[in-house]
């Protein structure tokens, strides 16, 4: 248990996770998250607020939690004049060689004193940031002022609690068709990272703002998944706030929203598969009490007519001559916030325009 009606369970299994795996409900398999940083800082207006002499908000006495790819601790933006670090505590989930944080089962914890000493000695064991995404977010949030370079973080006097997330496990990367070389973390590690940051803030007796610059295409975006529920509970507590990426994929074409009206038989969604795309998962979320079914047309012209899937039913379909495999499963809405979900897992995809036909039945229009 990690609190607030949320628990994480680890199960040792030799069997890979598949689309037909009936051991787990939809909402019990961790989702994978990717990086979502945006550099449009001036557009938020936050720098003007921070610069206002009447307000003078600089973050003194507060903490900012960075849960991301890590941080380049040796950067001057994160060091005081005496060489000590602005990072009061760091949990490296990817390193199993050191002392774990109290109450956690993996990773290595670094205190401010250990970090500062490691920087002075140029200790190669210090956690880093191979990607740079977490360092960027930390600099924007709490980087110290550099007058010569004209730079300042939003809250330059705030201090940092950092979690370097470990990357998603192999079985999840395979299940979600995440290519090699693409950074990805998993939902349960993020939830534990949030718990860690808050535990540090509580020990120090300081308010904390937690920055999550990660996101996922999966889920209903309705606040019903594990991480969203956990954040919703915690955000009601005093001295805890969250800053979360949203809207970063507004023009990327990864989402579709539609209404099937009573006079319509179905709606068509075109999705373009690029060269080199080996596979992906697509989800259809529908509002109850309506029931939704789908059909699919491949670029080669093979038409899979309307599939009447029962709740919980799984089907495996092979497209010829493309040799694409589609694993499709319908999930009942009772377990995931009142929405029907149809999950489509495409493997060995061929490029071109695919068509998804969405049928709705019921008294409503959505």
Residue ranges and their predicted role:
Residues 51-54, 126, 148-151, 230-231, ...:
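Generic recognition of flexible, low-complexity loop/linker segments
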Residues 169-259, 277-291, 297-300, 320, ...:
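Substrate-binding/access-modulating region of protease and related hydrolase catalytic domains
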